[in-house]
Amino acid sequence: MGVWRLKIGEGANNPYLTSTNNFVGRQTWVFEPDGGTPEERDQVEEARQNYFKNRFRVRPCSDLLWQMQFLREKNFRQKIPQVKVRDGEEINYETVTNAIRRSAHYLSATQSSDGFWPADASAPVFYLAPWVIGLYVIGHLNTVFPAEHQKEILRYIYCHQNEDGGWGLHYEDGGTMFGTAFNYVCMRILGEGPGGGRDNACERARKGILDHGGVTYIPSGGKTWLAMLGVFDWSGCNPMPPEFWMLPPFFPMHPAQMWCYCRIVYMPMSYLYGRRFVGPITPLVQQLREELHTQPFHEIEWSKARHLCAKEDLFHRRPWIQELFWDCLHTFAEPLLTRWPLNNFIREKALKITMEHVHYDDKASHYINPGSVEKVICMVACWVEDPSGEPFQRHLARISDYVWIAEDGMRITGIGSQTWDAALSIQALIACNLIEEMGPTLKKGYDFLKNSQAKDNPPGDFKRMYRHFGKGAWAFSSQDYGVIALDCTAESLMCCLHFSMMPPEIVGEKLEPEKLYLAVDFILSLQSKNGGLTCWEPARGGKWLEVLNPLEFFENIVVEHEYVEVTASAINALVMFKKRYPGYREKEIEHFISKAVHYLIQTQFPNGPWYGVWGICFMYGTYFALKGLAAAGNTYANCPAIPKAVDFLLKTQCQDGGWGESYLSGTTKVYTPLEGNRSNLVQTAWALMGLIHSGQAERDPTPLHRSAKLLINSQTSDGDFPQQDSTGLLKGSCAMHYAAYRNIFPLWALAAYRTHVLGLTSKAHSSAVME
């Protein structure tokens, strides 16, 4: 039988692994064939069966396996009795304190030895297939993902197959060509026959693919992977010429102008396109050619296939100018660049330059790369360049950084959310005002943040490689990851500012002010002319370049953009920093905050909310915006944007006192409630805190009492909160599952409620008695 174990901070014994902080923050799963007691194995199997039975009711998993492991290792038992609020009963201070303490103790018990909180950060169903395809075409699938891994991959695929036989872009999505074709190919590569798979999974999937025209209708991102596999032809893909790397960096089409994630995907993919790399045409590949196309492979008009896309995958239509651009490259540029003499001079030089960038990014990120999509393409490119080379071996050693195991099987995450979740968890615990009770937990969390702050800028001449400085800032996952993010920096900075005001006997050695100054410098560097904040690098390319967005299912991916929630986090952090260290760049910070507030006001929707890009959606954006505006001194009385936002939140409150928003808001940009007007506890927490920041407790606390009651009564017996719909978002169309959110935000909201609502009520009551 065996069990899976989550390991923390390991890697020092692998000669192909490097780290700047001794692997602090690294989380990897290992299968122990002889591990686990019979009771433990039964518990895991019960969790798997419960998930599968209820998978169409709640699509994201509860991420139970590592939590069961940690709670068992720490011998955790919830000792604080549960108290619920009955109908007609007022919430008192003791009841909410009881719920807060129960949740805080549960959160403390799930903290890792490194000080962060492990968690699943996934949902895009398409993350997994490129890894299976990539490892298959280079011949390393069975060594990297042996039998137990493959068993969990298949479990994951079966768990997330829709009732119609397809898979969507993410867990809650309807069937798409992209998701269905990718998962069908995975099942076949992993040994399932054309009629195999659980509940006839393969045949049901293939029927959906063929009924929608076959895989020539897969979106662009799928065409390239199927071309590498040999199930598609490269001439059916729109051009990705590596020669763009040879253009002057100021040229609009140069990758230097791109959003960093787009640039780093384009980088290795342009190399593979330039090489027209195709894996071995195995008997399986030949079978897939027959199974997935509606006509014989050699009769397909590949040039026409370049512009085909199933309507289910089409979130935004390509403008005619983009198709003209691709057609010109395909018809005129590529025939010249792939023939003598230009192929020997220009193309080969372009490919060499491209791989220089690939190797730089690999080394700068310790071969983790910015995300799973980028990682696997870089790994395949390194193998194509040199199958026995050290870069490829180092890539193999970092694959486990992306593997996550839960009760629904094995997935590939986008990237770990260690620092982001830690910064939010720490602030939630600090808000509880249980400093002595939670002291050891807070100290470990602070140690993790200190160990995760970037020690240096990217290596070498990073500006020549189109990277931004990042010394003193924080990344989304770990220090080794190396891709610095502003919102992670802002939230981590606020934690460090809180700790700077706490007794050293509780939090230990404090971060030097100079290291906080470095974080502030990074934040100040990313403000755009409109006052908004980008997240990774300054906005370089013009927004008009989005007309060339090659992905049919994502928006705003070509260049960097400003984000409401990132801007709000920056305001909060710098307001707090300015109070603690008023002498550092004070005038610049004041000007920064003024411009950022103006950006928030300008980006408010006419009906009151703000659009969030990284969370669903209007609830997420509105929570952050109200928090940022309040931090900058804006109130319900002096800022017209706040009453509009409050009106929106009050109008969308559900009957049970909560709030619930569908991921569909992201694509339509119109507020869309969850089906059945049901509530979501994480979104309820966002709305509750947003209203608290607006001063709602002073006007009418009734809506706040209703939502707090829902949170308290929804808490589970051990202090956890139940998993519900996904609450993260990726580029407008893809729901993201941040499993840690269900523990962080309800706790934070109840702590804010106790302090700012019940505390206010208590003061008012005391004043009335005294009068």
UniProtKB/Swiss-Prot annotation:
Keyword Cell division: no
Pathway the protein contributes to: Terpene metabolism
PFTB repeats by residue range: 150-191, 516-561, 642-683
GO MF, one annotated term: lupeol synthase activity
Top EC class of this enzyme: isomerase
SUPFAM superfamilies: Terpenoid cyclases/Protein prenyltransferases
Coiled-coil blocks: none
Organism domain of life: Eukaryota
Function: Multifunctional triterpene synthase producing taraxerol, beta-amyrin and lupeol in the ratio 70:17:13.
Family note: Belongs to the terpene cyclase/mutase family.
Official protein name in the record: Taraxerol synthase
Organism of this sequence: Rhizophora stylosa
